[in-house]
Amino acid sequence: MSANNYLFSGSIVAIVTPMDSSGEIDFVRLKSLVEHHIAAGTDAIVSVGTTGEAATLSIDENVKTILKTVEFADGRIPVIAGAGANATSEAIVMTKLLNDSGVAGCLSVVPYYNKPTQEGMYQHFKAIAECTDLPQILYNVPSRTGSDLLPETVARLAKINNIVAIKEATGDLSRVAKIKELAGEDFIFLSGDDATGLESIKLGGQGVISVTNNVAAADMAKMCHLALNGQFEEAEQINQRLMALHKNLFVESNPIPVKWAAYRLGLIDTPTLRLPLTTLSEHLQPKVEDALKIAGLL
């Protein structure tokens, strides 16, 4: 199946949620970010995922931010809603609120902190999928959740009609072939790890849900599109230029560094985050700035 035949593929930005200095959401800047990504060739936007600070926004703020993003996109770029929670009932409430929102799908994270079994994860995602017709993207990020959604469980979930994809953020490249083997070639594999994103496409993945895209949107779009067309050498040249960013945007917990980088580039007005996250430590700012320079962004 070609990349164009997949519902989700290419360079997908896990977009930051811009805030003013008091921590209120800056919807004017959010609109400008959406325009920026459309102009740069980004293939889709994930609204209020990990990078969008979903964990420190209220449900009302989450929904409002998603709806505003859909409004600003105006049908020109698909918007995927972060709709996960570690309580299945809460995730269902959030998902139902989005049923008629115009989103292209929902990204639902493995429940965090309470560490369910594989059967618990299966039942969690099954219950969410059954409450909606919206396409569902599973989100596996064990470094944050404390639990790993195994390929065998993904394969079980892939049998549910509207569970169509996974965002795999383990960085384990063997997962691409394993998930494709068990879940089928039609099941969409999206890397959630910028540093191994290109390699995952080479191995049969469909794209990257990217943090780096926030500050290097045009480069990430070009890299992903080249790779999906089999032009790996040209894609690798871009990837090498971005590699310092892929790594240094995680010198502190995401989205701390990427918000500072977006601020440094003038894409947002402040690097403000909601507590308990605080602005990038001063001694690490030169590392991120150097990565921006290596990428040719400064």
UniProtKB/Swiss-Prot annotation:
Recorded metabolic or biological pathway in which this protein acts: Amino-acid biosynthesis; L-lysine biosynthesis via DAP pathway; (S)-tetrahydrodipicolinate from L-aspartate: step 3/4
Part of a proton relay during catalysis, annotated site positions: 50, 113
Compartments reported by the entry: Cytoplasm
Gene Ontology terms: biological process: diaminopimelate biosynthetic process; lysine biosynthetic process via diaminopimelate
Record's GO cellular component terms: cytosol
Catalytic activity: L-aspartate 4-semialdehyde + pyruvate = (2S,4S)-4-hydroxy-2,3,4,5-tetrahydrodipicolinate + H2O + H(+)
Coiled coil: none
UniProt-annotated catalytic positions: 139, 167
CDD domains on file: DHDPS (cd00950)
GO terms of molecular function: 4-hydroxy-tetrahydrodipicolinate synthase activity
InterPro entries: Aldolase_TIM, DapA, DapA-like, Schiff_base-form_aldolases_AS, Schiff_base-form_aldolases_CS
Complexes and interactors: Homotetramer; dimer of dimers.
Family: Belongs to the DapA family.
NCBIfam families in the cross-refs: dapA
Function: Catalyzes the condensation of (S)-aspartate-beta-semialdehyde [(S)-ASA] and pyruvate to 4-hydroxy-tetrahydrodipicolinate (HTPA).
Protein name: 4-hydroxy-tetrahydrodipicolinate synthase
Organism, scientific name: Pasteurella multocida (strain Pm70)
